[in-house]
């Protein structure tokens, strides 16, 4: 019995053995990513796919300055409001900037027909040629061309639009007029004009010397006849009369004809348009700065090569796609706080590793060994490099596929098109929701795949070592093996590089394994004896206890004992 107890004590004595473990890199990163199954997973490395910053400035776009309308609206600029005179010389731009509530629009009150459509057309124009379609001095010899209004005053004096002429009677007459222009510019030409609606018949007679005036405008694609509406109206800018403004695009080779016997606000300058689909109109109060950018938003410029942004849905230039997400981060490294249990959609399990190694800094996966010569970490460069190449290619592919940069400007609707505008917003919101969902789902799936990919690589490295060692070592958990033989540094290196010589160490391993197995058998015998003794002893204690209780109860009358023969 003394021998058996001695053997039992020996089995609990710690013995030194050479070991090798498979593990992965860890660091002090606090980056977190989301996956399909988990949120806020801490990882060693990740890349951001969502741009959320801007410089708060208006910048040149690829070296070309924007057209800043300042206190002028698009209407004031294109009609030639006298207060917008500084804009007349501007003929090219990268984009157009309008403030939210510009003061100088149509100085003479009235209705601007299809104004939102005109803005839409101008949003795709990057330059134009302003030219005199009907020269002021020679086109209207029988009419007065100096009509002005106090509502369009400039420097304290009555004035009028720079691109229009207010024709009135001359020498008490207003002869019928007919004027045409043939477009020979090889570009679309924007032509603007107006029709005056006096507040009373007296003004009508004084200005045009007729009570039954008309204005006719005809081209291949446009035909309309206007009749002045003479009526008293509420004063706007101290005017009871109104001017309604109209426009059309004249195709190359087409001719536009103006006929009237009164009330015509004639075109003086027209615009030969050059389209540029990278242009647009934005509404912004951001200040102009000496900066250059590839992407401009109303809030500021974005200088980013990322595929997504959440700064603003309206963009001009080469811009990331707008999404409503607040976080789109793609993992490139490994879990920094790994889970022990099995996980993953794609079958990879590395749960046998409880923690990463901060001591291994030269690779993602590798080894830690311990023997009589010491201990140390070593990265598996081949598997690490293969993983880096694969993940880098995947990230680049995702960015390339999703990084379709473009301009996204708002659509224009007038007050009578509110239902259409609301419907358009709902459609745009629907597309935006789809884009956001697709972007988030893509990142979640790829993050799940990447983490499972790392798990799989660690598992493969473990299996590679296991297949080499076979029964020359035993698995002791936590990704480690304990050798049945002495394994010096040269031996450890052969395991790492896949050249481990199994037969060389098999005999030593067999002897040590048999010794250990013998100890296990002796231990089993001891355990069996102890188990029998324990069972018998506990049974005797139970019987003695029951007997004592029964005797006591019989002696005090609590229990009657009858013996029948």
UniProtKB/Swiss-Prot annotation:
The chain crosses the membrane at residues 529-549. The keyword tRNA-binding does not apply. Residues 18-528 are extracellular. GO terms for molecular function: host cell surface receptor binding. It comes from the Viruses. Keywords: Clathrin- and caveolin-independent endocytosis of virus by host, Clathrin-mediated endocytosis of virus by host, Disulfide bond, Fusion of virus membrane with host endosomal membrane, Fusion of virus membrane with host membrane, Glycoprotein, Hemagglutinin, Host cell membrane, Host membrane, Host-virus interaction, Lipoprotein, Membrane, Palmitate, Signal, Transmembrane, Transmembrane helix, Viral attachment to host cell, Viral envelope protein, Viral penetration into host cytoplasm, Virion, Virus endocytosis by host, Virus entry into host cell. The record marks 343-344 as: Cleavage. Binds to sialic acid-containing receptors on the cell surface, bringing about the attachment of the virus particle to the cell. This attachment induces virion internalization either through clathrin-dependent endocytosis or through clathrin- and caveolin-independent pathway. Plays a major role in the determination of host range restriction and virulence. Class I viral fusion protein. Responsible for penetration of the virus into the cell cytoplasm by mediating the fusion of the membrane of the endocytosed virus particle with the endosomal membrane. This is Hemagglutinin. It comes from Influenza A virus (strain A/USA:Texas/UR06-0195/2007 H1N1).
